[in-house]
Each structure stands twice: as structure tokens, then as C-alpha cells.
Amino acid sequence: MVQKQYRASPVILVMVLLCTASSFAEAQAESSDETVAHGKALVEAADCGSCHTADPAKPFAGGKRIDTPFGAIYSPNLTPDRETGIGAWRDEDFHRALRYGVRRDGSRYYPAFPYPNFTKMVRDDLLAIRAYLATLTPFSNEAPPPALHWPLNYRVVMRVWNWLFFKPGILVPDQQKSTEWNRGRYLVEGAAHCGACHTPKNLFGADKKNRPLGGGLVQGWFAPRLDGAERSGLKSWSADDIVEYLQSGRNGHSNADGLMAEVVANSTSKMSDADVRAIAVYLKDFPPGAAEPAVTPPPPTEMTAGAAVYAHACVSCHETDGSGAPRIYPPLPGNANLQSADPSSALRIILDGAQTLTTPRAPNTGSMPAYAGKFSDQEIADVTNYIRNSWGNAAPPVTASQVAKARKRQ
């Protein structure tokens, strides 16, 4: 039997190839769009914009001054400008920066850039971030060089720091925990880098490994404990309370102020419901951590003096019993931030005043005037001690000298 051989028509072959190429291009475009959207969500979770935007008209163009205990650094340009941004970077350059804290020229970043957290993220997520940043409007903006104290002004010193305190590696899921819990951990310890502010640091600016999420001082604000501590942690907050706070900037316990207000506005209020819920689930499972310090109440004379200042300046909004107007003027009894061992945030708010953050979920607002020019250091100390030790609250005493130091940070 003779077998007939068939030869495909050139026209048909071209049509098949064109259709295949078209389908592949469409699939690739869809994948690219999906990757960019995923990267955008991660950039928002990481709150990149807060540190890398100095001029709101030039988002992500860097140049923002960030003060640290070791001097000042300036955030770099993340836009795709080829000369001053990351437009000329390869994927491997970007991956190496976030995974290992290594700059394109081979020198080391300073850990104010939270690569100790980003190292825990999977490669695909890191490159999704790059994919999104590549879609931004490029701006030419060269950040100033760091202004750090000797010897940290030499980046080579960071090799020693990394050897002592940095362990690169992707976070391994805990198979004994739920998918939601593991997602929350990935965000808290990785992308959202909560510990960069909420974990106390040692003398070299590295996390104290024995006190994760135990509260930390950042640019004159105290980022409170996120562990299960009874007075100054999240023990009294439910998962729903945490979700409401992260999405709106307020709940029945507290309002977001200072740097945390930026985080809510630029990051957590934009995250998906599922991711915010995952963070809440993880944090509610976090152990109490270090014991809270025993507190000796202030002398009755100081409490009486503080009560007089409170009656004069605070009672009209916060009420005699401290109940306030929840979600506008936060309640003072049981307020974890107010009872933190470090009073820095309370002093900043009393001295500088506060404006309630508005978000799509909480558009109404309230304000608190600044009292720096109205009361003496001792009067500020008295009223701070009063609200930190009334209505069942308990916190270490604040002195007039602490208030004086807080004034200098204004």
C-alpha cells in the first residue's frame, strides 16, 4: 500500500503560527498584568511610598530624610528613571538588593531599608514588586548621600553588621498552623516588616531577638507592643478590633497617630480584607513576651495636680471618666499605647496635638490642640501621669525632665 503524504499549505501554516503567537502574547500580557497587580498589592503592604516619597508630586522618587540614632539617611529613587532610579537594573540586581541588602555597585545598604524582613519573601513576590515599580512615572531625582556618624559613614562596616545580625533566607511555613495564620506571619515578618518599628533594637540598631514585637522607639514615637501583653499589648483587642484599626485607623480602643497614621493611610487601609484578617489572626496568636514592669502609683499630690490639669484641658472631649468619644476621641481607660513603658507617644500627642486620621472607612474627624505652649514641663508630666494611672490604668511615672527632652524633639 502506498501512503499518501500531505504537505501543509504555507497559508494554513502561517495562520496557525499567527494564532499561536497571538494566544501566547495575550496569555503573557494577562500574566504580566496579574504580576503587576500583585506587585502593587505588595508595595502597598510594604508601605514603600511612605519612605520613598519626599515630594507628593513625585511619588516613589526618594530623597526623604529618615533620622536614626546613628544619623540621617535619604531614601533612594524607586522610579524607572535610568540614571537616578532603578530603570537600568536587572531582575537579579533588584532581587539581590531585597534578599541580601546589596546595592547594584556591590556595597551594602543600611538596615533602615528593611532587607532583614524582605529576605523572608519568595523570589516571585520580590520580582512582582519590581514589575509594578517599572510601571511608575520615572522622575530624575538623585538622593543625597547618608549623613551618618563615624564609622557607619563607611558602608563596608555593614559587612560586619550583617555577619553579626543578618541571616538571609525565605520564611518557611509552619505546617502546624492554618494557611491564614501563615499568610499573616509572612506579611508581619516579611512584606509589612512590622518589627522594623515594633521590635526594640540593641545598641547597634539590630532587633532584640528575645523581644519580637515588644515595642520600639522610632523618630520620637514609641511603636507599641504587638504581642499579647495585658496592659500595653494586644491582649484586650479582638481580631476584629485589629482589622478595624488597620483598615480605618481607629477602633473602640485607640486611634492611629504619628508614623502609624502614615502606615494606615498609605498601606493597611489599601490592603485586601483577607490579608488584613490574616495579620490579625497571626497577631492574636502571638505570645505575651516579656513581663510588663511592676508599677508604683504616683504620689497622691501628683495625681491631684494632674487631675486639675485634666479637668481644665481634657475633660470636654475625653469626659470625666476618660471614656471620650470612641473612634473620634479615643477612650483612655485600658488604652494600651497610653500604658506603654515608654511615654514618648503620649508626650508627643499632648505637646503637639493630634488630628484624627480620615480614611474611606472612617471619614469623620476630630482634633486635639497642642499644649506645649500652655503648660509647664511639670504640668505636662502631672497630667500624663494622671491619665496613665487612672481608671484602672498603670504605667511608670513620667518626670518633668522627660517632658523637657520631648519638647526638644518637636
Walk through the language-model features, giving the residues of each.
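Sequence/structural segment immediately N-terminal to covalent heme-attachment motifs in c-type
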Residues: 33-54, 59-67, 160-162, 172-202, ...
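Axial heme c-ligation environment in periplasmic c-type cytochrome domains
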Residues: 72-88, 93, 99-124, 145-147, ...
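Soluble non-cytosolic domains of exported or imported proteins
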Residues: 33, 42, 88-89, 120-124, ...
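Short, solvent-exposed loop/turn and secondary-structure capping segments
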Residues: 53-54, 59-64, 106-109, 140-147, ...
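Boundary of Sec targeting at the N-terminus
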Residues: 26-30, 40, 410
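Active-site substrate-binding loop specific to GH73 endo-beta-N-acetylglucosaminidase modules
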Residues: 61-71, 199-253
